[in-house]
Every structure is written in C-alpha cells, then in structure tokens.
Design a protein with these regions (language model features):
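Short coil turns that delineate tetratricopeptide repeat
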Residues: 22, 56, 90-91, 131, ...
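Canonical tetratricopeptide repeat
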Residues: 30, 64, 97-101, 139, ...
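Accessory carbohydrate-binding/adhesion or oligomerization-edge regions at the termini
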Residues: 101-214, 295-361, 366, 371-373
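Beta-strand-rich ligand-recognition modules
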Residues: 259-306
Length: 547
C-alpha cells in the first residue's frame, strides 16, 4: 500500500531547495538592478549570471541580462538570452511586441541570429490578436525581397491581408496641420467623376491606383508631389451579413477613418507607426460598406497607410470582399465604434501597477509607445523610471529616443552628457561625444574616442563606417581609401561601405566597371531599391564608356 505521508514528505523535501533557489535567484535580480542604479558596473553582469545559475527559468534574470548586453551593443548574447526568455515566459507576446524594432531583433543576418524561427512560429501559431503574426508576414516579405526571392516575398506580403484596391484623392491644404479639422469634399458623397479645388488651386479628383508598394502600404508620396497636404483613400467592403469587425490601420500622418460616412476613429498627431496601430471594432452592414481614410502631414516627411478588416483575432472574415468601384451602401446606419487599446501597452501598464519597482516594465512600455511614435507617453514613462532609479544608464539611453521623436534637442544634449558621466564606456554615449568632437574638428580627441570604440565593440560594420567617416572628416585621402578597402573586404554586404568603395573606384579609375561589379555583388544578397537605383544610375553615367 502506498504510504501517502512518505510521498508527501519526499515531495516537500524536493520542493524546498527548488523554492529556495528561486527565492535566492530573485534576490540576486533585485540586487543587480540596484547595482545598476548605483553605478557598480562590475556587479551587474555577475549578479544576473548568478541569478540565472540559481534558477535558469527566472524570466526577470534572463530579460535583465538581455537588456544589459543590448545596452553594451553585444547583440548576439542579448538575442540569445531573449530567446531563452521567450521559451520560459507564459505570455511572451507583449514582450515580443515591445522588442520587435530594437537592435537585438534588427540584426542584419536574421537567420543566423535565430530571429527567423520566431517569425515562422508566429506564422504557424498566431498570437491572440493576430498583430504579431501580420508583423511576421511583413518581416518575411522584407526578408525574401532583400534576397531577390520575389515570389516568396509576394506570398508573405499577401498573407497580411491588407486592403489593396483603392481610389485616392488630393492634395488638399494642410498648413500647420489645419486640414485635420477641415471638412473637405471627399468626406461627403463619393463621386468618382467629380473634380474639387485642391491645394493652391490644384484640381483634385479621384484616381484608381494601378500599383501599390509590395508590402501593402498605400503611399501617397508615390502618387502626389505635394507636401503639407491632406489625402484620401476610398474603398468598399462587402459583408455577407451584418457583423462586428475590426478596422485596423497603421499610418504615417494624422488619421481619420470613416465607415459608411460615419467617423469611427481619429488621431491628430502625425506619427510614423506600424500596422494595426489603431484598431476600432465597428458594425459592418450586410452588403457594401464605404471605408474612407483621411491622412494628413505637415510636420513629418511621409504620408501613407495600411488598412486591414479582420475578426477579433486578426484573421480574415469569411465572405468579405473589396472593390474600389462605386457601390450602393447605407449611409450612417450606426457603426457603434469601440476603440481597442494596444494589447502590449495594456499589459505593461498593468505590470507597472502591480510591480512598480521592476524597472524593466517601464523600459518595455516605453518601447511599445516609441515604436509607434508616441513620444510624450514614452518620455513620461521613462521619467518615472528615472525618478525611481536616477543612476541607471539604461533609462537615460532609452529616453533619448523619446526626446528625439519629440524633437527636444536641448534635452537630448543634456541627457547624453548625463549618460556619459554615468558610464563613459557605453558605445552610445561615446558616439555622441565623438560626433560633437568631429563637428568642431577636434580630431585628436575624436581619435581617442574612436580607439575606445575599437576596444569596446570591435569588428562591426558600424565601427568600420565610423573609421571611414573619421578619415573623410580629416580629408586624409590615402587613409580613406585604405580604410574603405579594409572595411569592404570584411563587410561587402553593408550598403554604406559598398557604395563608398564603388565611389572611390569611380573617382580613382575614371571608369565604372569595378563599381558596377560591386553593386552587382551587393545585389546578389541584398536586393534593395537603393542598390538597384544606384546601379541603374551608374549604367546611365557609363553609357558612353566600355564597361
């Protein structure tokens, strides 16, 4: 007969050391963050490592050490630790969203670093909202396009299910963003044949666009040459029945969304953001529904949007179809719109409420805000974190991005000085000081900082490009040529370095043959518009020269 008392005691005996290890590990994580704030640079890394050794499943330890490596621009270990974190974290999706555009996920060779499998896992196992899956489709489209595998690229872009059949109209006046509140004729009845008075008297009428960007974004700059303007996109959505649907939009520019002539979403700030940034649940009527997008820009340089119509999980609705052709629809039937907050922002806001002393949540919430250009929200979040830990360099480096997006240049300079005072060996802080010295042509002091970068982050394409820039600033032609040739041998797939090497070849040989070969070699692995256009321009310049 099984002795339940003995079994219970055995389980208790085995569990006590495990609980002790977890408690000890958590204590070391807290000590690591405290040391980070105090400036005990030599203690932070060992404490995180000891915490992981004590409990390899401690997600705070894995995440904290990943952030430490990323701050020091050691992206391979940063990404490796973050992948381990994802495997241990019960709800990894908010963390993936927050980290998506950070340097450790933006490394050039995403297959080697293991980012590629994360995308494929999202393709096969969508996140609850479907937003990360759509982002993975976009990344895979980009990945294959850069390699010239256009059929694969097109396939993954199409899986995003972005609406592609639109008519567009513009430009309309938007001086000092005044067009956001103005009601322009396209906001009324849709009339494809009508011509309206547009910006500066330019006739504005609806046009059916014959081609869009391969990634599914409707880019007004590709159809119009006018800045400081408001533009419209119009399409019709057919639903086999009345049903709730999510209208998901990402933009560069201010935004208003109308469904069946009813305003269901508006955002005044001109932000550069990602797909699904704005999500509103509304009623699609049975039959055809008019969807109108109003975008404006006056402070930024881009104006575009992507729209998706999905269910609550970000998946395609059955029986839905789209057409830019004029359709009969019921105007203002009552959409009952309800804006859905960003899931990752909500998650980290709740984590901060529950654990106000865990600084990583402030950093990740700021990442969520800043990746969608919410500069003020990101700044306020990081200010609170700095109030709690005024000596932590991670917080200062992140708030610089908030200041940059908010164009607060004085705050950037002050914060960078503070960051350099806290840790003069941070690559980010060194580069800021180095660039200031280069602007004032203090080359000797600048070279000292460049040498420090060589010691801290050796063997990177960024450092090689900085060395070329250093000799260019000094107008040291032999060194420019020498450093460029060295850099190109090591980093032929870096566009800045490859283009510089080609330019030097043209200048020194007065011929284009080698430059063409450099561009062609680059394009073998990096099929980009920039490289293609440069190669085409080189062919034109060399048209009278025997290549």
């Amino acid at each position: 007969m099984l002795n339940f008392r003995a079994l219970f005691l055995l389980i208790l005996f085995l569990a006590v050391p495990l609980l002790a290890d977890r408690s000890q590990s958590e204590q070391m994580v807290n000590r690591a963050w405290e040391a980070w704030d105090r400036g005990d640079k030599g203690e932070v890394l060992p404490l995180f490592e000891k915490a992981i050794a004590a409990d390899s499943t401690n997600t705070r330890a894995l995440l904290g050490l990943s952030l430490w490596y990323e701050l020091h621009e050691q992206y391979k270990p940063a990404w490796g630790l973050f992948r381990r974190f994802l495997h241990q974290e019960k709800n990894p999706y908010p963390y993936l969203f927050a980290t998506w555009t950070t340097p450790k996920m933006a490394v050039p060779d995403k297959k080697e670093m293991g980012v590629f499998p994360v995308w494929m896992d999202l393709v096969d196992h969508p996140d609850p909202t479907g937003t990360l899956q759509a982002m993975a489709f976009q990344e895979l489209g980009d990945f294959y396009q850069r390699r010239g595998m256009l059929d694969s690229s097109r396939y993954y872009y199409e899986q995003t299910r972005a609406l592609e059949d639109w008519t567009v109209c513009g430009p309309f006046d938007n001086i000092s963003a005044s067009g956001f509140e103005r009601i322009f004729p396209p906001e009324g009845k849709y009339d494809f044949q009508k011509t309206y008075p547009g910006q500066s008297g330019v006739p504005a009428k609806w046009h059916k666009i014959s081609a869009i960007r391969s990634d599914g974004w409707i880019d007004f700059r590709r159809y119009y040459a006018y800045d400081n303007a408001v533009y419209f996109g119009n399409t019709f959505v057919y639903s086999p029945r009345k049903q709730r649907a999510e209208i998901r939009v990402g933009t560069s520019g201010s935004l208003k969304v109308f469904l069946n002539d009813e305003l269901i979403l508006e955002y005044f700030d001109e932000n550069n953001n990602d797909l699904d940034t704005y999500v509103v649940t509304a009623d699609l009527q049975k039959g055809w529904n008019r969807l109108l997008i109003k975008c404006g820009y006056s402070e930024i340089t881009q104006c575009n949007f992507m729209a998706r119509v999905t269910d609550g999980q970000g998946q395609a609705l059955e029986g839905i179809r789209y057409s830019s052709e004029p359709q009969k629809y019921s105007a203002k039937p009552g959409a009952e719109p309800r804006v859905r907050p960003n899931f990752a922002e909500q998650y980290f806001e709740e984590q901060i409420r529950l654990f106000p002393d865990q600084l990583e949540n402030y950093v990740l919430l700021a990442h969520c805000y800043l990746r969608n250009d919410k500069a003020i929200e990101g700044e306020l979040t990081l200010r609170e974190a700095i109030r709690r830990a005024p000596g932590n360099p991670l917080l200062y480096q992140n708030i610089v991005e908030a200041y940059s997006r908010g164009e607060k240049f004085d705050e950037i300079a002050t914060t960078m000085e503070r960051l350099y005072d806290i840790d003069e060996n941070l690559p980010f802080a060194i580069r800021f000081q180095y660039n200031r010295l280069m602007e004032s042509e203090q080359f000797d002091r600048g070279e000292e900082l460049l040498n420090r970068l060589r010691e801290i982050v050796p063997g990177t394409a960024e450092l090689a490009a900085e060395e070329i820039g250093f000799y260019s600033a000094k107008r040291d032609v032999p060194k420019i040529i020498e450093s460029t040739e060295t850099a190109y041998r090591e980093f032929p797939d870096n566009w800045q370095i490859a283009a510089t090497r080609a330019m030097i070849s043209i200048q020194t040989t007065r011929a284009y043959g080698e430059a063409v070969e450099i561009y062609q070699k680059y394009l073998e692995k990096n099929y980009t518009i920039n490289a293609l256009s440069t190669l085409a321009e080189t062919y034109l310049k060399a048209s009278a020269v025997d290549l």
